[in-house]
Amino acid sequence: MKKGTQVSEKIPAANRQYKDTVFRMLFSEKENLISLYNAVTGNAYQNADDLKIVTLENAIYMGMKNDLAFMLETNIYLYEHQSTLNPNIPLRDLIYIGIEYQQYVDDKSLYSSRLQKIPAPKFMVFYNGTDAVDDRVELRLSNAYEQLAGEPDLELKVLMLNVNEGHNKELMEQCQTLKEYAIYVARVRKYTSEMNLNDAVARAIDECIKEGILVEFLRKNRSEVKMVSILEYDKEWEEKKLRKAEYEAGKEDGKSEGIEIGRDKTLAEIICNMIKSGFTIKKIAEVT
């Protein structure tokens, strides 16, 4: 968000259930989530109530954020949205699934002679950043091992799907909500090159509603979608700056003078903290 941006909409007082990405807002709705699951797996579940949401909301503040975690039959699925490439996702998912399993067996004894059954995990990332990425990429935990001889004793695989407009077309056709989400993101990116971020997001929302794209969702959640979109884009921009700074720091052969990464809070972090404290968008605009 740029200084001087004028915003007047209000959002509900935020709480620990606050959704920090449009993707998470959309697919936290069970009907949308079951549609996404069916598209990814080729299944045809009709009853969204078969899903049990097990996302660890407090894990966001522990640095172990995962957008969506749910159980279906005997499996547990971890879905995450990413707008920047992150090779550490398998390690993060390993820690996250450990917390999930700890909660799952909390009231059961792991020292008994009876085998404790647990849901089989499936890990997936939905990527819509600006870096060129294949439609499907497999990330492996073993890639992080400093030295590895032979097959790893511990492996974790994450399937990353490129969900930018024009990618994974068959998947998009199977999940209309995902397809329309990709269109919305593309509109925001297009207009940010032509106008300030606040106006770009507003225009993208207006156009999508007029063209029948995510109509019900955008009308119902307009103010929150607008703020979250601004936060997302600002975060994406800050992460790009961070990577550039890290690259430049590396070119200086380890010299630390003049470069301090991660010391100051970004504007997005400040806004996010204000939202969690219950500030309205109008008040946030006044102080930022």
Please describe what each predicted stretch is.
Residues 1-288:
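Elongated, amphipathic alpha-helical interaction scaffolds
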